[in-house]
UniProtKB/Swiss-Prot annotation:
Subunit structure: Homodecamer; pentamer of dimers.
GO CC annotations, alphabetized: cytoplasm
CDD domains referenced in this protein's UniProt entry, alphabetically: KPHMT-like
Protein name, as recorded: 3-methyl-2-oxobutanoate hydroxymethyltransferase
GO molecular function: 3-methyl-2-oxobutanoate hydroxymethyltransferase activity; magnesium ion binding
Function: Catalyzes the reversible reaction in which hydroxymethyl group from 5,10-methylenetetrahydrofolate is transferred onto alpha-ketoisovalerate to form ketopantoate.
Localisation: Cytoplasm
Residues at which 3-methyl-2-oxobutanoate binds: 51-52, 90, 120
Gene: panB
GO biological process entries: pantothenate biosynthetic process
Keywords: Cytoplasm, Magnesium, Metal-binding, Pantothenate biosynthesis, Transferase
NCBIfam families the UniProt entry points to: panB (TIGR00222), PRK00311.1 (NF001452)
HAMAP family: PanB
Amino acid sequence: MSTQSKGRKITTSVIRGMKKKGEKITMLTAYDYAMASLLDEVGVEMLLVGDSLGMVVLGYESTLPVTMNDMLHHTRAVSRGANNAMVVADLPFMSYQCSVEEAVRNAGRFLQEAGAHAVKLEGGREIAESVKRMTVSGIPVVGHLGLTPQSVQQFGGFKVQGKGDAAAQRIMEDAKIIEEAGAFSVVLECVPAPLAQRITDDLAIPTIGIGAGAGCDGQVLVVNDMLGIYERFTPKFVKKYANLSDNIRGAVKQYIEEVKNGTFPDQDHSFL
């Protein structure tokens, strides 16, 4: 939560209200209890249990191998650490594409079994019926348009989306369709900033940008990226607020040295 919203439970109505008041929304990914607790404590409004965990936690090359069991496991951990923040869980690849019924059933598991408050799924008009059925069933939904990582093979890599007139128009239409289907928010990833601004102005629901400029109603980053923990690849849109990899290396090197030379444990860290 921000200073204004810190200490109160974040709900879909709070998130919608923040757009109306012009208050920016903060979202970061979280994959475990410890990180979720820290982010919740300092005031992040929304914690996204992203399928990005496949890359930054499990070491895969993409999000595609991530399973429902993976996502449920990590969502449970994050939910236990979130006292006030809203927990949003990604529906992984092939958990919602085959049928509306399967999509709703899998989405419901995140709320029922893992303590999530909402789910996020990628796509536009092709998932509109699933979004509608989820919301009718009482499952809050966050949409995801632009660069949708689960479709990276179709896009031919991680590329900016919506650069041409036709592509931009389709994303704008999809955003409206997802809103009308019942989503309470939508993530816009890797789209030109002017397009994201137009979509933000056109929608009643909040937009959360990642590589979509400052005009969105909120921003999201992968926490491992912004803290400098994940070093395999850093997207252009990531600002590193820390470089914890160096801190971790330094601490572990000192530990190794002290164990090797016998200075750890000393009397202060021993039972006498």
